[in-house]
């Protein structure tokens, strides 16, 4: 919500694309919860259709097939979308499920998401990663991430065929600069072949926990397609809780949910700070006032506790903006939100030794051979953490 996106490329992606054929997808990183209590506590352990993915060496007799796991998916997971989230692979890889290629991923450091729905079956499923060297090493020569346990924060989960696909959320000043407006778009998906009704709602709570507004909307979505539900309620007294003002970082809580025949089906918790970061006359502004950016290169430590300690030390030095080299774990952005730190998000494009080479093919930005992978990395960065 407070990200300042590094202008590595200018891309206009209008919402998530419905991917009926599965494979790699691009959207905000989130896991739906079965109950409001677990959503508030970010407790994934009680979510029925959620599994930690911790692969190891996969063998067929004496032959090592690669890194992977045999995952048993019960009948209750089906009639759903089934997703895989991978992080900390450490190298490029080809993802195969039940002997079918799902995707080839060249970026060894950024999180990636996949729709496995067309590839999996009830019972045992072989999820295999064939690891290999990246074909585009030029894009990450200048960056080595902090070592962490391989596949940390990798998981599978399922969502109903009528569910939330993605969202865009911001809490911004209104045109009079007196109040706030919750600018919320909820992208819903219908995986059936025929139109289906979906009930979508939200609640928003002040930093002190007070319920400020809520709404529930019914929408009918055509078969195998997406639609967007938009909410824009006025939120009063927001200027009393401005994010970033004098170093304060109060956050509003937003809860998204869906219902089916009166029964709650999923909860997705969000946090958002009040304010809007803009470019005016070549200057970064917030609340129509210039912001002095004091930045430092920094990438997440091995865990959230160590990262929080290091971020606090940077803030004590007067740093107000963090500039990582590649997309970070979801909890990194949450920490920066809570600590009142801006983030200049960057795709995993790091080639400092070529920064002054203006010839064709010199820098990654000017190399036609790298164009497809370059744009893929920017796209992944944008969707992963744009909220």
Could you describe each region identified by the protein language model?
Residues 1-7, 17-330, 334-343, 377:
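Secreted/periplasmic carbohydrate-active enzymes, especially glycoside hydrolases
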Residues 13-14:
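N-terminal signal peptide c-region/cleavage motif recognized by signal peptidases
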Residues 107, 347-352:
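Short, acidic/turn-prone active-site loops that include or flank metal/cofactor-
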Residues 139, 354-369:
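Short beta-alpha connecting loops at secondary-structure transitions
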Residues 302, 323, 365-372:
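Alpha-helix capping and helix-loop boundary segments enriched in small/acidic/polar residues
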Residues 331, 352-354:
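Generic structural signal for helix capping and beta-alpha/helix-loop junctions
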Residues 345, 349, 362-365:
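N-terminal/domain-start segments enriched in small and hydrophobic, helix-friendly residues
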Residues 367-387:
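An active-site-proximal structural segment forming one wall of the substrate-binding cleft
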């Amino acid at each position: 919500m407070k990200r300042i996106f590094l202008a590595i490329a200018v891309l206009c992606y209008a919402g998530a694309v419905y991917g009926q054929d599965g494979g790699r997808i691009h959207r905000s990183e989130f896991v739906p919860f079965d109950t409001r209590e677990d959503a508030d506590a970010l407790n994934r352990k009680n979510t029925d259709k959620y599994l930690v993915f911790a692969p190891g060496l996969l063998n067929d007799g004496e032959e090592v097939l690669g890194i992977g796991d045999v995952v048993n998916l019960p009948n209750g997971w089906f009639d759903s979308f089934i997703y895989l989230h991978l992080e900390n692979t450490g190298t490029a890889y080809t993802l195969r499920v039940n002997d079918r290629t799902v995707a080839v991923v060249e970026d060894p450091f950024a999180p990636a998401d996949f729709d496995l729905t067309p590839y999996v079956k009830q019972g045992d499923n072989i999820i295999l990663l064939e690891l290999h060297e990246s074909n585009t090493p030029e894009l990450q020569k200048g960056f080595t991430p902090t070592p962490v346990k391989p596949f940390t924060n990798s998981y599978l989960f399922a969502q109903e065929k009528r569910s939330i696909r993605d969202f865009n959320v911001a809490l911004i000043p209104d045109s009079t600069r007196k109040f706030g407006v919750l600018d919320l778009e909820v992208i819903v998906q219908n995986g059936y072949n025929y139109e289906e009704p979906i009930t979508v709602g939200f609640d928003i709570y002040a930093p002190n926990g007070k319920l400020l507004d809520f709404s529930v909307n019914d929408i009918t979505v055509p078969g195998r397609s997406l639609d967007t539900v938009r909410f824009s309620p006025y939120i009063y007294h927001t200027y009393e809780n401005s994010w970033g003002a004098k170093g304060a970082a109060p956050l509003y809580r937003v809860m998204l949910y869906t219902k089916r025949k009166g029964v709650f089906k999923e909860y997705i918790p969000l946090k958002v700070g009040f304010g809007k970061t803009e470019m005016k006359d070549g200057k970064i502004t917030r609340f129509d006032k210039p912001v002095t950016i004091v930045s430092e290169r920094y990438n997440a430590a091995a865990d959230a506790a160590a990262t929080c300690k290091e971020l606090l030390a940077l803030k004590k030095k007067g740093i107000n903006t963090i500039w990582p080299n590649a997309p970070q774990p979801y909890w990194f952005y949450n920490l920066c939100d809570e600590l009142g730190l801006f983030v200049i998000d960057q795709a995993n494009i790091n080639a400092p030794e070529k920064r002054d080479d203006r010839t064709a093919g010199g820098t990654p930005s000017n190399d036609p051979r790298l164009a497809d992978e370059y744009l893929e990395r920017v796209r992944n960065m944008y969707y992963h953490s744009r909220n």
